[in-house]
Structures are given as C-alpha cells and as structure tokens.
C-alpha cells in the first residue's frame, strides 16, 4: 500500500491544489494497520545498493561514503522528516549550491524554503533509490507522505515534489506533528528493538513552536529507539537560543545542523583537515548512527576518531 496522502486506511490522491485545502485539517495520528505492517516488513530487507550507488554516483559521492550509508541503513531502516512550511520560510537569507561546468559549484542566496526544498527532494529521491521508507510531514500542508516503499512507480515521490513547490504559509505547529511521529514510532518500536534498530527524526525549522511546549512533545522520544536531528533553517539568535534551551531540558541526544556553509566553517574550526562537502552534509541530514559525525562540528577528533572518519569517507 502506498501512502500518497493517508486517510481512513485508504490511499488518497491529491493534486498540488489540495495541499492548500488541507492546511487546517486535523493531523493524522495513526497509520492504517496495513501500512504499519508493510513498513515493519521492510525493516529486515537490505537496501537497494545497486540503485543507491547509481543515484549517488551522479551526485559525486565517494564510494566509501556510499558504503557507509548502505551499511547504516541496516541499523536505521526508516526516517521521519518534520518540515516547516510556515510563512517565515520565504525570508531570503538561505543558501544553496548552484552547480555549473564540470564539477564546479558556487554558493548563492535564496529563500529558506528553497534551501530546504533542495535538501528534502534529494533525501526523498535517495529514499526511493535505497528502497528505505521515509515519512515527510509538512506543518501546514499535505497529509503525511511516505516514499521509498517501491510499490507505486514513483507516484509518492512525484507528489512530494509537487507539495514542495507550494509557497510556504501559516504558523509553526510543531507539537502536533511531533506527537503524531511519537505515536507512529511507538507502534513500530517493538519490531525495531527486536531487530536492534532505530529510526531517525529530523525536524527542519526556522522558528519556535506555535502550538505548545516542544520539550514536552519531544520527551517521549527519550524512551523510544530514535535518533533526532535538528536542521535549523536560520541563524537568528532568538531561535538558536530557543532550541538550545529545549536541548538542555531533555535527556535526548540531538544532532543540530546548520546550512552546509555554516557547518563547514564550524567543522574547520575544530577539524581543519576535513573537507566538508555536500555529500557528507546530506548524509548527516538523512540521519546516521555514527557518533563521530555528530561531534565533528563540536570538538577536535582524537586519533582514533580521525581514523574512523577516514574509514567512513
């Protein structure tokens, strides 16, 4: 069963215009039983390494990093993405890479939404190549979208791209989506623990929650097999301080990521020997269970950690 908009256990078709109509509907709290069973059934299946290598080679990923990703997918068989599509995402202080010529690129200014869209589309396409399921939840828009099941000839991925073309608008109801993700993970937690696996939850946002206490919403994740990535889409001090305060309230390991350029500057300050490119940034956004990748922007790696990072790359 595909998940091109899920409602009452049935596959529901939407067009780009229906994204707007769904802006104020109730957040879906439960998966249909059939979808949950289908997802659990993928957890022991190996990722499609051949398709992944072909896709990532076109994006100039080194072989070592591709192997690291494929191996890690056996430990993390599913990913969740909570995507902030609030009105502030149209502010033009984002950054994205424009590629030109042979293996050349430059950083250019764009909206926060354009920066995030580029990332989300890549990760969704990566999910399709790997056949590793990912669920995308927009704060104000479409029903949850699951890609990477390989059962709908790319229909879910096409819908995902259509949704990301919409103009962001609305508030920042993070808590509702976090609560829904908590419930979804709880429903598959037994299967994950049995397989010694985890899932990742990436929250991509540029602001503060408009519908409650985010720390309270995130707290149940401390008892679930999950890794959390916070992808900040702004460097505004009030927002950074807000999320730092939440991090301090929780016994939850949160990997905080900025845009690629700012991450590269931070990493250069601690580990100047490392070239931080797009491939490594996308891998960290996708979410991996590699501790060294969590700390490269926070501290200088010791000799053993450096050896491991070189192995992963």
Report residues per predicted region.
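Von Willebrand factor
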Residues: 72-198, 200-204, 209-212, 233-241
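Von Willebrand factor A/integrin I-like adhesion domains
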Residues: 161, 218, 235-290
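VWA/integrin I-like adhesion module and closely mimicked acidic/polar interface patches used
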Residues: 93, 166-172, 207-250, 257
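Acidic, polar low-complexity linker/tail segments
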Residues: 19, 26-105
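Intrinsically disordered, low-complexity regions enriched in proline, serine, glycine
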Residues: 90-92, 128-137, 147-149, 190-195, ...
């Amino acid at each position: 069963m595909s998940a091109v908009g899920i409602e009452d256990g049935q596959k529901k078709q939407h067009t780009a215009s229906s994204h707007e109509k769904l802006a104020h509907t109730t957040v879906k709290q439960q998966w249909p039983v059939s979808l949950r069973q289908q997802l659990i059934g993928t957890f022991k299946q190996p990722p499609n390494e051949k398709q992944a290598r072909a896709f990532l080679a076109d994006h100039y990923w080194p072989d070592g990093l591709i192997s690291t990703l494929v191996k890690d997918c056996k430990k993390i068989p599913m990913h969740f993405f909570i995507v902030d599509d609030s009105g502030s995402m149209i502010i033009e202080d984002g950054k994205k890479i424009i590629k030109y010529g042979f293996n050349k690129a430059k950083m250019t200014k764009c909206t926060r939404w354009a920066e995030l869209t580029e990332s989300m589309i890549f990760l969704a396409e990566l999910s399709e190549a790997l056949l590793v399921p990912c669920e995308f939840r927009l704060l104000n828009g479409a029903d949850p979208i699951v890609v990477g099941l390989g059962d709908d000839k790319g229909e879910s991925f096409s819908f995902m791209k259509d949704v990301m073309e919409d103009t962001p608008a609305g508030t920042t109801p993070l808590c509702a989506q976090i609560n829904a993700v908590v419930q979804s993970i709880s429903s598959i937690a037994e299967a994950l623990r049995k397989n010694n696996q985890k899932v990742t939850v990436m929250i991509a946002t540029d602001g503060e929650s408009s519908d409650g206490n985010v720390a309270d919403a995130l707290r149940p994740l401390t008892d679930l097999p999950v890794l959390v990535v916070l992808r900040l889409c702004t460097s505004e001090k009030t927002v950074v301080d807000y999320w730092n305060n939440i991090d301090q309230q929780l016994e939850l390991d949160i990997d905080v990521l900025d845009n690629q350029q700012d991450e590269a500057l931070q990493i250069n300050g601690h580990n100047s020997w490392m070239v931080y490119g797009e491939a490594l940034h996308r891998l960290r956004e996708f979410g991996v269970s590699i501790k060294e990748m969590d700390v490269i922007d926070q501290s200088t790696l010791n000799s053993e950690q450096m050896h491991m990072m070189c192995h992963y790359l």
